[in-house]
Swiss-Prot record:
Gene Ontology cellular-component annotations: virion component
Record has DNA repair as a keyword: no
Keyword Cell inner membrane belongs to the record: no
Protein name: Minor capsid protein p49
Family per record: Belongs to the asfivirus p49 structural protein family.
Induction annotation: Expressed in the late phase of the viral replicative cycle.
Function (record text): Together with the penton and the other minor capsid proteins (M1249L, p17), forms a complicated network immediately below the outer capsid shell, stabilizing the whole capsid. Plays an essential role in the formation of infectious virus particles. Especially required for the formation of the capsid vertices. During virion assembly, associates with the membrane and probably mediates the docking of the penton complex to the inner membrane, where it recruits the capsomers to form the penton core.
Length: 437
């Protein structure tokens, strides 16, 4: 069923001309209430997809329909009530990137990425309804391509004065392309203000660019599977059946370990007191810390290759983040740092379009097979399989661990417990970054 849905979804996107070109009024016809009820997630994932005409969950089992796709609008998080992600094809005409330069490598692999991820790759700017946010600024010299009236998308008059609420909001909604990545600048950690609607008071917000977007780009550049709708924040809108929420976190952890050579440590056996829940909790927390390290480095060094290659500077960045991981005792931390340092040169490709694409092969079963190294079995997920070269169960990785190391004996600090158990975006924040204008 998932395969059939994905095929229809991709056929809609690939149609020439796009199926929704003759249906543009649909983009402005939804009320805020319908948008909220259909697309806002909650702390446990996503609410059911509501029927378009009745606004009731009567047909939620069918998942998102093609009519929904033409008005695709994902929320940045449950508190961002009205900020939507625009349709991929709608935003493509005013992309600042030559199409053949960005999408050549994706032609044969496009089905491997979820629709949400395709939106993330293609999108430069958020399209919002005129009546909801009249202050949204468009990209330079692109107003004539916007779906709404140009008057509803005024240019940013004073981009340097970020204290103005409209300017702050405009910076937030200007999403970056690959060309913008080298220009990212650090603004320092800011305390999240109430300029984006109802937020949790005192929550730290990860800059003007959503953490999820940055993480998707990093995954693409590092050959990791790009379907990470709910990796860090633990929330998102699953495609297909809204009641099926695959454990994308575990998929990312296993693939990240395979590509980076950073093992997540010896997992406790299932017959221990905490069992599988403890393993998953610890592995998720470990990958969160790995991503925090990488994000902190990129934010503070503006993704400049000459700085990324400065290993002493990078080492200083990495060693300043404590604690490293509950899995890694003091004897193992040095080896862990060396592994992180070897990752950095791979990310230079972010700045020059040369990020490699994972090698996917289609299976006759119509599903993907991911090796679960903890069970030495195969678990099915979707239509394609990344060809990994190693994994957590690789004997080469296992021999590097101290034989007497017991992960379950490592106590958690109060800060770790607070960050790991909170389950909201505050656990994912490093330092603020925003596009330079």
């Amino acid at each position: 069923m998932y395969h059939d849905y994905a095929s229809k979804l991709l056929a809609d996107y690939r149609s020439d001309p796009p199926l929704w070109e003759s249906d543009l009024p649909r983009h402005n016809r939804y009320s805020d209430n319908i948008l909220n009820s259909r697309y806002c997630g909650n702390k446990n994932g996503a609410e059911p997809v509501y029927n378009e005409s009745t606004n009731s969950p009567g047909k939620a089992e069918r998942g998102l329909q093609l009519s929904d796709l033409r008005n695709f609008s994902f929320m940045l998080n449950p508190q961002h009530k009205n900020i939507g992600y625009g349709d991929a094809q709608d935003l493509e005409p005013y992309s600042s990137i030559p199409k053949n330069k960005l999408f050549n490598n994706f032609k044969n692999h496009r089905p491997a990425f979820s629709t949400h991820t395709e939106n993330l790759i293609r999108r430069n700017v958020v399209r919002t309804e005129k009546k909801t946010f009249p202050q949204v600024a468009s990209l330079k010299s692109t107003q004539k391509h916007c779906l709404t009236q140009p008057s509803s998308l005024p240019s940013l008059k004073n981009p340097k004065n970020i204290s103005v609420p409209s300017a702050r909001f405009s910076e937030h909604t200007k999403f970056f392309s690959y060309e913008d990545l080298p220009k990212l600048k650090t603004k320092g950690a800011i305390k999240h203000e109430q300029h984006l609607g109802d937020q949790m008071s005192g929550q730290y917000y990860n800059g003007y660019i959503p953490h999820k977007d940055v993480y998707n780009i990093l995954c693409l550049a590092h050959n990791l599977p790009a379907s990470v709708e709910k990796v860090i924040a633990g929330r998102g809108i699953p495609l297909g059946n809204p009641h099926v929420k695959p454990n994308i976190e575990q998929e990312l952890i296993k693939s990240a370990c395979a590509y980076t050579g950073i093992p997540i440590g010896p997992l406790p056996s299932k017959d221990l007191q905490h069992g599988r829940e403890y393993q998953e909790f610890s592995a998720n927390r470990h990958m969160l810390q790995v991503s925090n390290i990488l994000h902190s480095v990129f934010a503070n060094h503006s993704i400049k290759p000459q700085i990324l290659e400065d290993i002493p500077t990078l080492n200083a960045q990495l060693t300043s983040i404590k604690p490293i991981s509950p899995f890694l005792n003091k004897a193992y931390q040095t080896h862990y740092m060396e592994n992180i340092v070897t990752l950095v040169p791979r990310f230079k490709s972010i700045a020059n379009y040369s990020s490699p694409i994972p090698n996917y092969s289609k299976r006759d079963s119509g599903q993907a097979e991911y090796f679960d190294t903890s069970k030495q079995t195969i678990s099915r997920h979707n239509n394609y399989i990344p060809k990994y070269t190693g994994g957590i169960g690789d004997s080469k990785l296992d021999t590097t661990f101290p034989k007497d190391f017991n992960a379950s004996s490592v106590p958690l600090t109060s800060a770790e417990k607070d960050h790991s158990l909170r389950g909201d975006n505050s656990a994912c924040c490093i330092s603020s970054i925003s596009p330079s204008l």
